[in-house]
Amino acid sequence: MKTQSAGILLAMLLGIASCFAQGNPESIALTNAAQTLSAMAFDSGSGVTVHARVASAVWPERAAGMIVVEVGGSTEKYAFSTAGVPAMAKQGLSRFTLKPGDEIIVTGVLANGNLKIGPGFNAARADLITRIDGTRLFDRTQLPLR
């Protein structure tokens, strides 16, 4: 009973803390950017693969996630649309398994017309995300068909 009560209390505290974190202006702007990015059309003929460092990740409730990365040794930045939180969680990708500073390799496609989002981020859709050691974090081909 004590363990169950402690678990419930911890879940409540985490929920409260995440509400405060998501209410700041930067988080709201990132969530809005993720929603905009998830609605974009992507060009299957404009493939891109980057070896980059995670700058930020956004896990909105009702839209696809977004991972913002910075390419090492350059000024290139990308905002990659992923999938909804439940679909990513089924693959093991969450805010606990992918953190700012992590080095990853992302393969995907650019938005139609090479559109930018936010302050100069290349808009793209992630099809495959792996760690440097080859561990697969996200694979669009493994998402359930709609």
Which role fits each region the language model picked out?
Residues G7-S18:
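Bacterial N-terminal signal peptides
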Residues A52-V54:
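Conserved hydrophobic positions within beta-strands
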